[in-house]
């Protein structure tokens, strides 16, 4: 399978959108393109599983590799490939692009321009996950960031210009750290290439990058990617950005874009600078991620805006991804990838339902919402399912991911790590506080105004989006083994290098 198809199809969608003359044609292009991408992602999963059976059990295959020299003086290649981690992230991206298209169709003005930038954002995300050349990854990373300013600043709500600028400046600051770290690895590895696997192979032994050098570039890369993963104290852009973003952008941003942070930390920072993961910096980041988990959950408790509640919840759950990576156990790392997949699905469901309620009610304030289960039962069930998954209720995706993380975390017998794990576990109780408060208040308490009684339940477009995400959240919770197996196949050999 040629992985370039995941870039080519969105490019064709851009062309189709550019030529579209009315909203009907825009809808046709988006539905067709998103459906093709989802179908290709499902096919990729099955093709990967089939190809994986022919590989040795102790190897993490980078399958469907493709390399074309791009800028030879600097040895930059257009290099593509996927392992189990990439495959599940590509599937997650396609699910959210597909459901996001349906979820936001009734809401957004200037649909042609909106979906042009939305599709460009998806190109950056797809390209990042299929790239195995650091420079190509960075290029697609930047492509994913650029549309965010316009999507929030033009189509957002509230303090949208402030939120868009704050998000852009913070993430561009992270990009500056990333390019320094990437160039540092390129020059000090001696491999004369940006390709991740070639660098890892070259530096595994006598040509290892000196530990003192690794300790310089590791924090730059971890913080650079960690900013996108809402690492404390660099998380402040995230709640404002989520709250102001339009529905589909919130879904893709929280569901997928933030996962680029954890993916980059594991794939580049930890994999290529393994000596630095055993020193001072990993303990610093363990403390910061523990703070992220607890601080995000506590902050969600004091919010009244549904989007801010979910945004701070995302800070907590994405902090759990980085926390698991810092635990330095294979089980916890596998849990981190599962958490990326699980959180992506359930937070997309949250933002989809919240956006649909806000579109009609004109408010996201918990204090002015109530009795929605009687008025809009379908959307209310969607919100309840997202809340239960967020709680980690057995049978939903959140339970599988969080249990894997905490079991893996307790495998580290060091007292410092045990204390951090116990503190992080308190977030489970705090999460129950704000989730149950919201579910009880907005779904079952008295309807506060006659305006809410005029709300209508989801349209067919919205039902497709919500039902699809509910099925994915429940499906991953009930049948997690397929994802867990291909993730462990990829995590194991990477950890053999790190440890």
Question: Model-derived features: where do they sit?
Answer:
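Cytoplasmic/organellar membrane-interface segments at the starts of transmembrane helices
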Residues: 376-378, 435-499
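Select subsegments of transmembrane alpha-helices in polytopic membrane proteins
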Residues: 2-3, 252-259, 462-466
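Hydrophobic transmembrane alpha-helices and their helix-loop junctions in integral membrane proteins
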Residues: 99-105, 123-135, 149-441
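Central hydrophobic cores of alpha-helical transmembrane segments in multi-pass inner-membrane proteins
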Residues: 4-19, 31-46, 90-104, 121-123, ...
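Transmembrane helix-loop-helix hairpins at membrane boundaries of multipass inner-membrane proteins
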Residues: 1-2, 17-102, 106-116, 192-193, ...
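Hydrophobic alpha-helical membrane-insertion segments
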Residues: 32-50, 171-183, 379, 383-391, ...
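Alpha-helical transmembrane segments and their helix-start/interface "positive-inside/aromatic belt" motifs
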Residues: 23-35, 162-174, 376-381, 459-468
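Short phosphate-coordinating micro-motif centered on Lys-Gly-acidic
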Residues: 142
């Amino acid at each position: 399978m040629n992985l370039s198809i995941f870039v080519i199809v969105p490019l064709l969608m851009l062309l189709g959108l550019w030529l579209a003359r009315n909203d009907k044609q825009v809808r046709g292009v988006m539905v067709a393109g998103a459906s093709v991408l989802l179908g290709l992602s499902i096919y990729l999963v099955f093709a990967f599983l089939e190809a994986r059976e022919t590989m040795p059990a102790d190897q993490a295959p980078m399958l469907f590799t493709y390399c074309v020299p791009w800028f030879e003086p600097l040895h930059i290649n257009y290099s593509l490939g996927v392992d189990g981690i990439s495959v599940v992230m590509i599937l997650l991206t396609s699910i959210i692009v597909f459901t996001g298209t349906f979820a936001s169709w009734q809401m957004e003005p200037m649909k042609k321009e909106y979906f042009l930038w939305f599709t460009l954002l998806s190109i950056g995300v797809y390209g990042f996950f299929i790239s195995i050349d650091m420079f190509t990854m960075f290029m697609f990373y930047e492509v994913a960031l650029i549309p965010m300013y316009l999507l929030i600043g033009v189509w957002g709500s509230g303090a949208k210009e402030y939120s868009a600028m704050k998000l852009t400046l913070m993430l561009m600051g992270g990009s500056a750290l990333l390019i320094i770290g990437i160039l540092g690895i390129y020059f000090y590895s001696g491999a004369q290439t940006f390709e991740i696997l070639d660098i890892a192979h070259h530096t595994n032994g006598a040509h290892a990058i000196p530990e003192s050098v690794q300790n310089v570039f590791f924090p730059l890369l971890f913080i650079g990617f960690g900013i996108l993963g809402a690492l404390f104290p660099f998380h402040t852009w995230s709640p404002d950005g989520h709250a102001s973003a339009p529905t589909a952008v919130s879904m893709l941003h929280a569901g997928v874009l933030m996962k680029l942070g954890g993916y980059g930390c594991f794939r580049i920072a930890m994999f290529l600078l393994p000596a630095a993961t055993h020193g001072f910096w990993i303990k610093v980041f363990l403390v910061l991620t523990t703070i992220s988990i607890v601080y995000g959950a506590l902050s969600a408790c004091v919010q009244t805006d549904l989007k801010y509640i979910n945004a701070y919840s995302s800070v907590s759950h994405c902090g759990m991804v980085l926390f698991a990576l810092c635990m330095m156990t294979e089980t916890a790392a596998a849990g981190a990838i599962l958490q990326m997949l699980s959180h992506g699905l359930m937070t997309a469901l949250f933002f989809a339902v919240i956006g649909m309620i806000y579109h009609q009610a004109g408010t996201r304030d918990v204090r002015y919402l109530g009795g929605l289960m009687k008025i809009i039962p379908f959307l209310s069930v969607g919100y309840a399912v997202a809340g239960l998954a967020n709680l980690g209720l057995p049978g939903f995706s959140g339970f599988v991911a969080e249990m894997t993380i905490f079991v893996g975390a307790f495998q580290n017998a060091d007292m410092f790590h045990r204390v951090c794990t116990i503190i992080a576990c308190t977030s489970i109780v705090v999460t129950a506080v704000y989730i149950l408060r919201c579910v009880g208040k907005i779904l079952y308490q008295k309807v506060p105004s006659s305006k809410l009684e005029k709300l209508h339940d989801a349209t067919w477009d919205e039902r497709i989006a919500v039902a699809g995400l509910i099925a994915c959240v429940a499906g991953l919770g009930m049948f997690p083994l397929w994802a867990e197996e291909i993730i462990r196949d990829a995590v194991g050999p990477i950890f053999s290098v790190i440890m």
